[in-house]
A protein has these predicted regions:
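Transmembrane beta-strand segments of Gram-negative outer membrane beta-barrel proteins
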Residues: 10-25, 43-61
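Outer-membrane beta-barrel porins/channels
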Residues: 4-19, 69-73, 87-332
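Short hydrophobic/aromatic segments of transmembrane alpha-helices and their interfaces
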Residues: 24-25, 31-32, 145-146, 201
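Generic detector of contiguous secondary-structure segments
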Residues: 33-42, 151, 311-313
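Surface-exposed strand-loop-strand hairpins of Gram-negative outer-membrane beta-barrel proteins
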Residues: 23-30, 59-86
Length: 332
């Protein structure tokens, strides 16, 4: 039973086998869901169908201290704030079909999500200017972002040692934002900041993979996913930088696996997620809100302030018997 976490808003792995070794599977070949990490592995897993789901129970909240400056400076009322909605279902499905001894085609479906927030009180009530109804903060306050990916993979053996793979990816994402009315006054598009229901965008990109079986013990792997170019969130173009642009950032993985004995295998992956490539995520989050300024919805507008993320994944697998495999992993 894996302990669940995320790398930013990315899942650290897709499918139970991947999650159980903290996602360190770019150089592993143990299932069709490995296509989410490295499509080059599929030609080595044979015909198979996999389906399942994970229950994700993150704890989300924050504490507002009582040392904020007094008005006219806005502040959040001091206290403990805990988000509602503690349990999320993340399904997955994957299949692989061998076209011949040298090639295969597969389908994989995965998702990111489960880190939404929903606070029951009007958290930003003190940010509202008096006497302006359209800027009065409401409750609940929160953001709900969901992403789903469908990949169709082709994998081919170039030799006994080398295989490659390519996965065109269809991505669908949705977002809903509530309770941010006071921030309309700082937006280029004040009617497209908050409380506009659920907006959906569709887009896609490509993942490439390579796997090298150096010998019976050592395998090396690498994969690269392009930026996923998405339609803009038009309903929230006044909130996100570049008028609602929320592309999914590119990332790459490098890794190896080493089979010490027929029973024991160790795996390591290095992943880099390039959040700074997407302005809505990478733009600074520490801009000063001055009356009359326009900080939201512009190309240089407020972002999450996230840097590119380096992720290190370690996994170990023990094939105890033909019927039992034990795995453990750590992602940092």
């Amino acid at each position: 039973l894996p302990a669940m976490a995320t790398n930013g808003y990315w899942s650290y792995g897709y499918g139970p086998k991947s999650k159980s070794i903290a996602g360190a599977c770019v150089a592993m070949s143990f299932g069709a869901m490995c296509a989410a990490s490295n499509p080059a592995s599929l030609v080595r897993v044979g015909n198979r169908i996999e389906a399942g789901a994970s229950l994700f129970a993150p704890t989300r909240g924050f504490t507002a201290n009582d040392d904020a400056q007094t008005p006219p400076y806005a502040s959040i009322p001091p206290g403990e704030y805990k988000s509602a909605n503690d349990l999320f279902l993340l399904p997955h499905f994957a299949s692989n079909y061998m076209l011949d001894e040298q090639s295969s085609i597969g389908v994989a479906i995965g998702a990111n999500g489960g880190m939404n927030t929903e606070y029951d009180s009007a958290v930003f009530a003190r940010f509202s200017p008096p006497g302006v109804p359209e800027y009065q903060a409401s409750a609940p306050v929160g953001v709900d972002l969901k992403q789903m990916f469908v990949g169709i993979s082709y994998s081919r053996l170039l030799s006994e040692e080398h295989s490659i793979g390519i996965t065109p990816i269809l991505a669908v994402q949705s977002i809903s934002v509530t309770g941010l009315e006071p921030f309309r006054m700082f937006s280029k598009y004040p009617d497209s900041v908050t409380n506009n229901g659920t907006d959906v965008s569709v887009g896609g990109g490509v993942r490439f993979g390579w796997l090298w079986r150096v010998n019976q013990q050592l395998k090396l792997g690498a994969s690269y996913q392009t930026r996923l170019w998405m339609q803009k969130f038009d309903s929230y173009k006044g909130l996100f930088a570049e008028a609602g642009d929320f592309d999914i950032p590119p990332n790459f993985d490098l890794g190896f696996s080493y089979r010490f004995t027929p029973e024991w295998t160790f795996a390591f992956d290095y992943q880099r997620i390039q959040y700074s490539e997407v302005n809505a995520v990478g733009n600074p989050a520490d801009l000063v809100f001055i009356p009359g300024s326009t900080l939201l919805g512009t190309d240089d507008g407020l972002g999450f302030g996230w840097n590119d993320q380096n992720v290190y994944k370690f996994g170990v697998q023990w094939q105890y018997s033909d019927d039992l495999t034990l795995r453990a992993g750590y992602s940092y």
